[in-house]
């Protein structure tokens, strides 16, 4: 088990794993923090992340078993201790790890007597069994057991139809959920307008992913869901007091920031609030009054745009770009001779 003492940053938004352990081959636990957050942000992120962890991450499962010797699901086979239904339930519990897509075949070919476990499954090269000791069946007599299997990668639940028997083939209820459970909690600190929050996120997985891998996958899936909104273009809008149609671009500096969008740095910029930049109170208040709340909002404005803000001076612009050191990180052509 790994534990770290929690140290809270008062400046840059950051996340950290503060506890990590493997309780068994099929149960991993991780606890993470994200801070500092403004009031209300921790719940917003925590709720979305929990839903993504439980519903958006893909897993690999056995979805079908085939055998010509099986008349129906609740039948028994001489020499096997378990019923067919019990064997199917044991196959359902097998935890697999893979990056395959589509349906792939696997099989079990064993001669008794002896115990049949997960290590007896013959798998495609790209599929890994997390716990080879998982029990499947007990053969009491020297009989041959041949079962064909189908393996799929998906997400969420896949419920079998009521009539699932077809030519000795049985579909299996699949739970494509590497994350067993996820919880979030919020800790507030500070006073008055300075109040901030820490998000605590707890993740339990089945061993096919570590909690850190699950957090990364859920975050990426959430980003992918929101990217269409970032690339959308607002064609036009109507003013209430007249019928003039005005076409405005959604973002300024579209061409200059094309590369930035490609590598998703835009997402990071929208997560950095000007509250975290340690700006002078006067500059901070001027930006807030102009609806500039994040670093992304700030980068949409040229030097000339900033100078149009009431009570803003050239020294204030210099101060902002001095803090950001923007010329080292972003290609934005600002007139240097005015500094």
Curated annotation (Swiss-Prot):
Subcellular location: Plastid, Chloroplast
UniProt-annotated stretches for the region Alpha N-terminal domain (alpha-NTD): 1-233
Listed EC numbers: 2.7.7.6
Pfam families: RNA_pol_A_bac, RNA_pol_A_CTD, RNA_pol_L
Presence of keyword Hydrolase: no
Gene Ontology cellular component terms for the protein in this record: chloroplast; DNA-directed RNA polymerase complex; mitochondrion
Key words, A-Z: Chloroplast, DNA-directed RNA polymerase, Nucleotidyltransferase, Plastid, Transcription, Transferase
Protein family: Belongs to the RNA polymerase alpha chain family.
Binding partners and assembly: In plastids the minimal PEP RNA polymerase catalytic core is composed of four subunits: alpha, beta, beta', and beta''. When a (nuclear-encoded) sigma factor is associated with the core the holoenzyme is formed, which can initiate transcription.
Stated name of the protein: DNA-directed RNA polymerase subunit alpha
Organism: Populus alba
């Amino acid at each position: 088990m790994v534990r770290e003492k929690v140290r809270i940053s008062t400046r840059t938004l950051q996340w950290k794993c503060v506890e990590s352990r493997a309780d068994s081959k099929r149960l991993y636990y991780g606890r993470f923090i994200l801070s500092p957050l403004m009031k209300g942000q921790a719940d917003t992120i925590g709720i979305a992340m929990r839903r993504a962890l439980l519903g958006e991450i893909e897993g690999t499962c056995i979805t079908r078993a085939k055998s010509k010797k099986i008349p129906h699901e609740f039948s028994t086979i001489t020499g096997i201790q378990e019923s067919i239904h019990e064997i199917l339930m044991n196959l359902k519990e097998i935890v697999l790890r893979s990056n395959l897509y589509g349906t792939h075949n696997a099989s079990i070919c064993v001669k008794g007597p002896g115990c049949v476990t997960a290590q007896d499954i013959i798998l495609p090269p790209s599929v890994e069994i997390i716990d080879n000791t998982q029990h499947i069946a007990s053969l009491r007599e020297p009989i041959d057991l041949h079962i064909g299997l189908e393996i799929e990668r998906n997400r969420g639940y896949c419920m079998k139809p009521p009539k699932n028997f077809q030519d000795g083939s049985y579909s299996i209820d699949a739970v494509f959920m590497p994350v067993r459970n996820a919880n979030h909690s919020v800790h507030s600190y500070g006073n008055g307008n300075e109040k901030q929050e820490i998000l605590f996120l707890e993740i339990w997985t089945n061993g096919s992913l570590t909690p850190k891998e699950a957090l990364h996958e859920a975050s990426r899936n959430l980003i992918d869901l929101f990217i269409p909104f970032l690339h959308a273009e607002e064609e036009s809008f109507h003013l209430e007091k007249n019928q003039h149609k005005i076409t405005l671009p959604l973002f300024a500096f579209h061409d200059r920031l094309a590369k930035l969008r490609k590598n998703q740095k835009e997402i990071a910029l929208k997560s950095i609030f000007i509250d975290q930049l340690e700006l002078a109170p006067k500059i901070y208040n001027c930006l807030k009054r102009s609806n500039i709340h994040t670093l992304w909002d700030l980068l949409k404005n040229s030097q000339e745009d900033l100078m149009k803000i009431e009570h803003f001076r050239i020294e204030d612009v210099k101060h902002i770009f001095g803090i950001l050191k923007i010329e080292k990180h972003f290609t934005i052509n600002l007139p240097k001779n005015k500094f």
